[in-house]
Amino acid sequence: MAKESIIFVGLFTAILSAAILLVSCAGNDQSLSQYVKIKVQDGDTLWSLADHVAEKKHINKEDFIEWVTENNHLQTADIKPGDELILPVKKKHPAVYQLAIVN
């Protein structure tokens, strides 16, 4: 009987852990859906995006780059045309947004 109890507790713990992990991952994706997503254009860099957004939204440039890197799972600060990035700018309307960068 003790062996069955140990197996039950182990399975219950594994299932509960998996459920918590799934909920936390889904919650993160859902929370990011409130932010603007852009498509990187020729000449865009994280710093040029930071300059553009920081000026209008009063965001610290270093904090902007850290947020974008972390929430877009970037390994480096290198971005290329066609990449899609989520920016720390909340959507005002559920419409599609495109950020135009003037170089």
Swiss-Prot record:
An example Gene Ontology CC term for this record: cytoplasm
Listed Pfam families: LysM (PF01476)
Gene3D superfamilies, sorted: LysM domain
Matches recorded under InterPro entries: Cell_div_suppressor_YneA, LysM_dom, LysM_dom_sf
CDD domains linked: LysM (cd00118)
Cell compartment(s), UniProt: Cytoplasm
One GO BP annotation of this record: negative regulation of cell division
Role description: Inhibits cell division during the SOS response. Affects a later stage of the cell division protein assembly, after the assembly of the Z ring, by probably suppressing recruitment of FtsL and/or DivIC to the division machinery.
Family the entry assigns: Belongs to the YneA family.
Name assigned to this protein: Cell division suppressor protein YneA
Protein's organism: Bacillus velezensis (strain DSM 23117 / BGSC 10A6 / LMG 26770 / FZB42) (Bacillus amyloliquefaciens subsp. plantarum)
